UniProtKB/Swiss-Prot annotation:
Transmembrane segments: 5-21, 40-56, 63-80, 137-155
A Gene Ontology biological process term: protein folding
Stored Gene3D superfamilies: DsbB-like
Annotated organism of origin: Nitrosomonas europaea (strain ATCC 19718 / CIP 103999 / KCTC 2705 / NBRC 14298)
Protein name listed in UniProt: Disulfide bond formation protein B
Gene symbol of the encoding locus: dsbB
Length: 164
């Protein structure tokens, strides 16, 4: 069970690293919704890493899984919104969004602008893999994290089943 938390943390680190690669090497600028998703990946990954290090019993595991579900569903909502905007760009208002102004004023954006500064277009769907855009993949991954955390939340640990 512990290894699953480590895998989630490593997947999150890989996804955030790949997002930085797309930004810095390919010039794909992140929009405000992309930054919110990055933050959600950070929160899911750090929570999973803490769960791996802590190796909690049932109550602690449920707390960690609950946080992963919460952060993953928040990320899924944002990714779903962006996936919708990519398909229906006419629904997006031009100009600087309140989210962009808010994000760019956060201390994180000043401390690490490459990671947390938003200056891209939320309707940009140019990058695709297997006919799915980045927000589509992000939505699927966040939902998968929620499902996995839900299954871990419900599961019994091997040690507790041996005690009965």
């Amino acid at each position: 069970m512990r290894i699953i938390f480590l895998l989630i943390a490593l997947i999150c680190a890989g996804l955030v690293s790949y997002a930085l690669y797309l930004q810095l090497a390919d010039g794909l600028l992140p929009c405000p919704l992309c930054i919110f998703q990055r933050m959600a990946y950070w929160l899911v990954g750090i929570t999973a890493l803490f769960a791996f290090i802590h190796h909690p019993q049932r109550l602690g595991r449920r707390i960690y899984c609950g946080l992963i579900i919460l952060f993953s569903l928040a990320g899924a909502i944002v990714a779903g919104r962006q996936a919708w905007l990519v398909r229906f760009p006419e629904a997006f208002e031009c100009g600087i969004s309140p989210e962009e102004a808010f994000l760019n004023e956060l201390p994180l954006a000043r401390w690490w602008p490459d990671m947390f500064e938003a200056n891209g277009d939320c309707t940009d769907g140019t990058w695709q893999f297997l006919s799915l855009t980045i927000p589509d993949w992000s939505l699927l991954i966040f939902l998968a994290f929620s499902l996995i955390a839900g299954l871990l939340w419900r599961s019994r640990s091997i040690s507790s089943s041996n005690l009965k």
